[in-house]
Amino acid sequence: MDDHKPIETPDGPAVDTPGIGARRYETPPTELPITEAEAARAAGLAHNEHLKIASGYLRGGLADGLLKHATGAISEDDGQLVKFHGMYMQDDRDIRAERTKKKLEKAYSFMIRLRIAGGVVTPKQWLILDNIATTYAGSALRATTRQTFQYHGVIKSNLKRTMAAIDSALLDTIAACGDVNRNVMAATNPAQAGAHKIALQLAKDISDTLLPKTGAWREIWLDGERVVGGEDAAEVEPVYGKTYLPRKFKTVVAVPPSNEVDIFAHDLGFIAILDKKNRVTGWNVTVGGGMGMTHGETDTFPRTADVLGFVQPEDALKAAEAVMTVQRDWGNRKNRKNARLKYTIERFGLDAFRAEVEKRIGKKLGAPKPFTFDGNGDRYGWVEGDDGRHHLTLYVPSGRIKDIEGGPQFLSGLRRIAEVHEGDFRLTGNQNVIIANVPAGKRAEIDALVDEYGLTRGASALRRNSMACVALPTCGLALAESERYLPDLLSELEESLARHGLQDEPITIRSTGCPNGCARPFISEIGLVGRGPERYHLYLGAAFDGSRLSKLYREDVTASEIKGTLDPLFAAYAKDRQPGEHFGDFVIRAGFVAKTSNGPDFHERTGPLRAA
C-alpha cells in the first residue's frame, strides 16, 4: 500500500484512499488535457503548454531562427522547443561578464544529447561520434548519467552539420530532452548476458513505442532527407497529442542484483524478476521516482519510486504506455515545479494511480515479486559473461572522454580500440564505458591498447563510486562548480579515509551544481548540492543500493569546510561500524542524521542530530 504523505493542496475535493485511513488525496481529473493555445492561456496553464500546442508539433520558429546569422542564439520560445530535439542553448559563463563589459553577445553554443536506448553503440558508430567530437565539440565526448552521450560547445552554424553526422551513424537526438519520455536506460551487468539482452530489448522497445512521431526533427535538421528509406508518418501524435507531457519522463530497466541504473530515481522502471537460471519471468513496475527540487520550496522534493505491481513480459509495453499516458492526463500543467509523476502520485495516491493504469492495460497488475539489490555502482575490470564473452569496464572521471594532458588519453585510446574491436561499447548510468562482447582471443590486444593509453590508471574506491554533473561553465542552472570541483574534493577525502583505514571502503559520493539533481545526489551516501559559489548543502544517509533518500546534514557548507565536516564521521564509522555496514546506514544507526522515509519527509528533521 501507499505509505507516502500526500501533498496538502487547495485544489479540488479530497477523497479517502482505501487502506490509508486518515490520509486524503485529491479526486483524479476526468477531462483530457487542453489542446487549444488560447484555452490553455485562459486556464492559467504554464507558458510551455500553449507554446507546445502552437508549435506545429515542435517546429515553432526553429527553421527560421537557424537562418539568423547575426546572432549565435535562438529565441527564448525556440530555446524551449529545441529541447525536444535533444538540445539546450547555453553560453560560456566563465567569460560572460567579460563579454558583457565589452558589449558583446554572450558566447552562445548548444549542448546536444543523443538518444541511445540502453547505451549501446557499435565500433563504427563510436568512430563517427568521435569524429563529430573532434570536428564540432572541442575534442570531447561526455558520457552522461543516463547512458548516452552529450556534446558541448557546438555553435549554431554547425548544428545542422552535427545532426547530419549523427544521422549518418543511424542515431538521433529526438526526445533526448523536453517534456517526453527521454533516453531509456537498461542494465549493463555483463555477467548476466541473457538477462541483459532481454532488458536491452525492452529498453529499445519502450524507446520506440514512446518516441514522438512528429517529422519536425528530420525536416528541420536534415532538410527532410532520409538516410534509410521509408515513408513519413502522418502528422499526428497518437500517444502524446499536441501537448506532449507536463514535464520530463524518465524510464529505466534494471536486472538485480545490480541497480546501476538507479531505478528508484526515475519516473518509470522495470525490475527483472529472474528464475534460478537467471531467466526473466516478468517485471516489477516502479513509478514516481525523481530527483529535482527547488531550494527553499518544501513542496518540491526528491522521491524514490514505489513498486506498483508485477507484469508478465507480454504486458510490459502496455504498462509503460499506460503509466505515461496517465501522467499525460493527470499531471500538473499549471506549475512546472510540481509537474513530474512523483507529484502526481503524491497528489492522487498510489492506489488511484494503480487503478487507472490497470484500466488502461485492461487487466490487474500482479502482486510485486521479491527482489534484492546489492549496490548501484559498476563492476570494474574484466568480467566474463554467462555466454563466454568478456567485458572490460573503464572508470571515466565524470564521463568526460577526452585526452588529459599527463593523464589518460580517453578519446585517442577508445578511438584506437574502436578500430580493432569486434564487439560493442556500452555506457553505464555511472558515466563509465564498457568495452563489451570481447572474444577471449582479443583480450590481450585490448589490454595492450588500454595500457598504452593509460585507461586503467588506479582510482580509489571513493573515486570509482563518484559522479558529478557538468555545472559551470556551460549549464545555465548551475549555482556552484561540480565536475571541475569534485576531483580536488575527492583527493582531500581520500587522504581522510586513508588516515582512518577506510581507503578501500566503497562509499557513494555525488555532486551537482544545483538542486535539479542530474547526478542523483539525493540517493548517494554523501551528496553535495550547489547553493552558490563554493557553497553546498551536504546530504548524508542514503542507501548504498540507491533505495533510500538522504537527509540534509549541513546547510551552506563552504568547499573548504567539507573535509573537516566529514572527517569526524569517517572516524566514527571506522571505529563503530558493524560488519558489512555501509556508511549511509551507519550515520543513521549511530544517530548523526535522521532517516528519510520518502517524498515530503525529505525536508523534516534536517541537520545533525548529534555532534560527531
From Swiss-Prot:
Gene3D superfamilies: Sulfite Reductase Hemoprotein, domain 1
Record note on cofactor: Binds 1 siroheme per subunit.
Pathway: Sulfur metabolism; hydrogen sulfide biosynthesis; hydrogen sulfide from sulfite (NADPH route): step 1/1
InterPro entries assigned to the protein according to its UniProt record, in alphabetical order: CysI, NiRdtase/SiRdtase_haem-b_fer, Nit/Sulf_reduc_fer-like_dom_sf, NO2/SO3_Rdtase_4Fe4S_dom, NO2/SO3_Rdtase_4Fe4S_prot, NO2/SO3_Rdtase_4Fe4S_sf, NO2/SO3_Rdtase_FeS/sirohaem_BS
Location of the region described as Disordered in the Swiss-Prot/TrEMBL record: 1-26
Family indicated by similarity: Belongs to the nitrite and sulfite reductase 4Fe-4S domain family.
Protein name: Sulfite reductase [NADPH] hemoprotein beta-component
Source organism of this protein record: Methylorubrum extorquens (strain PA1)
Name of the gene this protein is made from: cysI
